[in-house]
């Protein structure tokens, strides 16, 4: 590989660890690797990702363009040995053609950028939220009484047809659009490709960067960082045909943010449905065959809107836009940004999108999104494995099954005379299958069984006549017949007709049931079924236990895959599970230090309390009242040594409640004092409750106000709760972080027993040696997987503090198990380095003295 850039076009003077990060990233992209990057929050990770990847991309494009021009000149020289001047002329002409296309595009985009700036100022006091009026009627469900019953009748269905190749297969999973709409989208795709090819010179296989994060909020922050960056042109200097006054080096970053219909829909009546599934289905309903033109969505691009879609494309590329900007642009232009954004995709360099749109095959197909030979970067990837499993898991309750059964039975009875052979047969099969599942759940409620447990799928399908069902054919019928859409549409129509509608949109229950039936009839070796009893209902869940195969198709398609996060440790899960099939030479892991100087962090374990109790928060010992009281006195002492804000993380809400109950009790011989009152002498106490939801923000504001008032505050939080992820406790909000115990998942739960059993079995099957050795290796793999789940949660809590170069904090891990080498080995590198400097075990009083010395003389801010 050639030499790398010096500073990777970083907008500031990069720190040494940022340079290390960008160099490693550049190399991984160039060599087509899969890599895991850990860089603590506050180290400028986002800019490092942007600058490292975009610098590589522009250099890659420059080389590709040079090769294209060279090949063109070689082709010209193939005819009877053309003279040198002719070859040079061909080379210049090829370069000129590309240069002119790029220059024309940049000029158009610059003009749009200036226009948008003017519009922003002009419309500051206007009505920017209003959609531009289209020359079509606004969509509406109309007067329900005028709806024709025909729209709810299923099309004839032939499950034995050999070929069912439709436009929806070509365009992805967007079944339900009318044939004309599908043809239109296909035609647009071809026309946009052709016209844009002429305008920009982009090729279909131009490498792109797909940047993925968990939420649109995180993606918006990334977009803000992207606006800071200016990249050199991908045009080789020797190919430039411009004069001295023309700056060919000006080439803006071409960015597109993708979102779901729920994020991008601009149709008020569809948006008002609120529920994502309902929005998706109503959108498709408005495009179905037979829907009158005036009833269709007026914002869906039509053939006459081709020019407008191209304008939308250019407006999108002119400036960096987040998801809100895309919605506003669609409203201003009166065109659906969800569909119009497809015209932008091909011409983008960097595409941002949330987890579900990348990680779900059906979502990628719906967007016509190919990642073949492109770069995939997944940020905030510490929970990637869980996210993949959750996306491909489905939960349903007995009450929802009963509702779906009632709706389906009513629909079948109402349209009995008009349902022909195959439709009638399959609907009867679905009713039998749902009844079988519901019967099993009802019997589970009645039996003296644990609150949760595993379910054998054969038990769910043991009902009368279910054994005669062909799972493959019924699965295909559910996916292709649009039954759920027809039934849910009929239910809504009936409610409106009978004036039973309310303002609250209903969730399409049959779609949920359908999504559950598909894995039930096509069981995966990586999935399991579980039940959970609660209140007067029972929940049934299909859970994906292993994300490997679902992510594998992304890894095998992409040129390179990068996982990045502030706390990616422990790393072994990626090597042993998610990427177990990858050759070691293709997989790299990197863990970088912090930008703070070493003296700004003190990290320590604490084994004994001020009264001498050994802190052992294992399941068998954690309820010791003596230990919990000693913990309270120790926390009080630590709060005296640590200024401003301290955040303490407990293993669970239940255990925090147990501790608070003991801390509220009057202490013997201390005149009514409690542990809480002892702590409150030092700091005000606030705590995170279960299911706080929107109240979390109020809690944080109160915590901040208390600290700003000079009182100091202790915030009692829970690992895995709202405050343990995504919340920044920078500066005086997080001068101290206390981790009480280790938050191991409940090993007795059916889910975790299944997970560990799966890991052990998979490891056993892939290992070699004697039976004893294979069993030992399998047990060790299960133990490691279980510990990693715990330590990943711990590391997330630790990462809440130290958010920038000048920040400083103390981190205290309270439990004897934190002394173990295998546990410390799973901590982030920057924490381990701090602990090595203070490797001697310290009693609580000595640690408090160390903390006092650490904070003395430091100015709070």
Curated annotation (Swiss-Prot):
Residues 114-132 have a biased composition (Basic and acidic residues). A motif (DEAH box) lies at residues 379-382. Residues 4-431 form the Helicase ATP-binding domain. GO terms for cellular component: chromatin; nucleus. It catalyses: Couples ATP hydrolysis with the unwinding of duplex DNA at the replication fork by translocating in the 5'-3' direction. This creates two antiparallel DNA single strands (ssDNA). The leading ssDNA polymer is the template for DNA polymerase III holoenzyme which synthesizes a continuous strand; ATP + H2O = ADP + phosphate + H(+). It comes from the Eukaryota. Pfam families: DEAD_2, Helicase_C_2. The keyword Manganese does not apply. Its main location: nucleus. ATP binds at residues 39-46. [4Fe-4S] cluster binds at residues 265, 283, 297, 336. Its cofactor is [4Fe-4S] cluster. Residues 114-153 are annotated as: Disordered. Binds 1 [4Fe-4S] cluster. This is ATP-dependent DNA helicase chl1. SMART domains: DEXDc2 (SM00488), HELICc2 (SM00491).
